[in-house]
């Protein structure tokens, strides 16, 4: 069976040499040390990883007809990804993200402009419905429009497909959407936003996981930056 991702944007990464918090003050300018551009996004990165690990991956996204959309296509070609479920917007640009990386603290800040991938339509979802039904996993994230996420998740749940949600970039989601998800993968900030529990210890992570379980999530994975990863499968 297939694994399916809904994804895409292009990432611009700027390393800074700022030694204190990477958060910039109003009007502040800092000197960067390196800049690079490449295809990325939560779904794209996860899909490529699964593909390289031998998975049968179907990528679904919407691109603009622009130079950045071409970057995404070339990146897919470079790793041999299938392009059967790509859609195009004639009037909205390809999604992008600007990532500021503090090279000393190994922390980053990200501004996401979803662009075309936030315009997936009912017609687009109808075109991939059979592919979702025949998948083993559906991997979603919050860069695409939430109505597309919810419709895709309903199709998956109805057909016994396990749904994994990467909760970035954070936006509020309904308890109905969370109910029945196989796995959620927030970071500490997103976990707090979604549960009201500040994840500053393993005990607090237990508390956040308990809230997710009450909402019907089966498994919880919280990324903790330099401290590693918290995993709890008690809801399964």
Regions found by a protein language model. Name each.
Residues 84, 88-89, 99-137:
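Conserved phosphate-binding/catalytic loop of the ribokinase/pfkB sugar-kinase fold
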Residues 61, 140-142, 166:
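Glycine- and other small-residue-rich loops at beta-strand/loop junctions that grip anionic moieties
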Residues 150-235:
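Conserved phosphate/ATP/ADP-binding segment of small-molecule kinases
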Residues 48, 96-100, 109, 228-232:
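Short beta-strand scaffold segments in enzyme catalytic cores
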Residues 75-91:
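A glycine-rich helix N-cap at a beta->alpha junction
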Residues 1-62, 67-78:
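Glycine-rich phosphate/adenosyl-contacting loop at the front of the ribokinase-like
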Residues 80, 118-123, 163-169:
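Short gly/ser/thr-rich secondary-structure transition/capping motifs
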């Amino acid at each position: 069976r297939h694994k399916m991702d809904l994804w895409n944007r292009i990432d611009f990464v700027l390393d800074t040499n700022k030694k204190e918090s990477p958060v910039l003050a109003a009007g502040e300018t800092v000197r960067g040390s390196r800049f690079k551009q490449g295809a990325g996004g939560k779904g794209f990165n996860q899909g490529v990883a699964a593909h390289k690990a031998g998975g049968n991956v179907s990528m679904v996204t919407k691109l603009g007809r622009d130079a950045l959309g071409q970057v995404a296509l070339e990146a897919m070609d470079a790793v041999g990804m299938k392009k059967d479920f790509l859609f195009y917007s004639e009037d909205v640009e390809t999604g992008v993200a600007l990532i500021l990386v503090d090279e000393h603290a190994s922390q980053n800040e990200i501004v996401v402009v979803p662009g075309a991938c936030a315009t997936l339509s009912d017609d687009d979802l109808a075109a991939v419905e059979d592919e979702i039904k025949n998948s083993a996993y559906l991997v979603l994230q919050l860069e695409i429009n939430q109505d597309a996420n919810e419709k895709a998740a309903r199709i998956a749940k109805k057909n016994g497909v396990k749904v994994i949600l990467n909760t970035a970039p954070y936006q509020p989601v309904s308890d109905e959407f969370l109910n029945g998800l196989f796995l959620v993968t927030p970071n500490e900030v997103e976990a707090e936003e979604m549960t009201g529990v500040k994840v500053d210890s393993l005990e607090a992570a237990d508390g956040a996981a308990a809230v997710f379980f009450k909402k019907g999530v089966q498994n919880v994975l919280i990324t903790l930056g330099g401290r590693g990863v918290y995993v709890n499968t008690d809801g399964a």
